[in-house]
Amino acid sequence: MATKVTIQDIANELQLSRNTVSKAINNTGVLADATREKILRKAAEMGYKQFAYLPLFQEDAAKTAEPFLLPSDKREIAMLTTQFLSSSHFSSMMLDRFQAEIDHLHSGMTIHRISPIELKEKKLPSSLDIQCTAGIICIEVFDYDYAQMLCDLDVPLLFVDTPVMDMRPPLKADRLYMENRIEIQNAVAHMVQRGKKRISFAGDKNHCQSFFERYMAYKDAVEYFGLTEGLSTCAMPSGQQNYPATLYETIRRFKTMPDAFVCANDFVAMDLVKALNELGYSVPDDIWVCGFDDSQEASYFVPRLTSIHIHEQIMGYTAANLLMTRIEEPSLNYRTVYTETNLILRESTGD
């Protein structure tokens, strides 16, 4: 039976104190980098339990530590979208961070808008040269069949939000979302604690996976509190054409108005507030409204909008990490990552 290697054995080999070796192995205290590396290298060589199966200090370790660079003939990171992404869209700041993270790869990020015809015919944008493309990041690409076509390209691919995935085969790509459930449920709980009983949802739950998750979080919350009356007055018109007018017509037909609305995003919430005002209701005096995204407009809209904050910087950092590691290791299992969100209480919920 092999003799168990101890910290004292390593200390004896290196003629160092046991305390110094312990600091290096447990990553505690202050040590010179050279000393720490020498100890860890010796621990790996001797087969110490934490390092026996880890090739941390192989001769080619220096090679693996070298910065990863894209091949010279594939330096383009392509961003695909079906929409014009204004500075108000959460992805604006996210993409700034994403681009900053990939700059060291000597790559260029190009933006390609998918036209309605290209979307329908499942064709790539004419501006995109797939032969020069190292990876693709998709934002606002919510057509499932088109997304499947992109997955079949055999190009490293990341979706920031996706089409609704309920009861569908998963996309063969990495997926990045903001956390959609926890803070929606906290928003509902806040409304219930403040005496609101009829709580409804506004927004097209089938627009994208995030909207669907927000709706399901809302539904689970009202069912948990036993307040299901609000389910009958949800305002969920589908489609994007003339949405404010469609939303107005939807709520105008309600015989009973909710006490509060949870909305799919801030822009739905702002359209809803305007529609309620036109119908003679005051927010928050008569009806409370909560959005999602914490867009720039949310803080200066009248009334200032309670919303759920998306951390664009961490989304940008995570997006870069997911896509770059996919380019480096194409055989990795597909990953689904959620980043933290936070409820921000403002005037539209009486705060």
Regions found by a protein language model. Give the residues of each.
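Amphipathic helical "hinge" segments at domain boundaries
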Residues: 2, 48-124
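Hydrophobic alpha-helical segments within soluble ligand-binding/sensing domains
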Residues: 174-202, 241-249, 269, 310-328
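Flexible loop/turn connectors
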Residues: 248-351
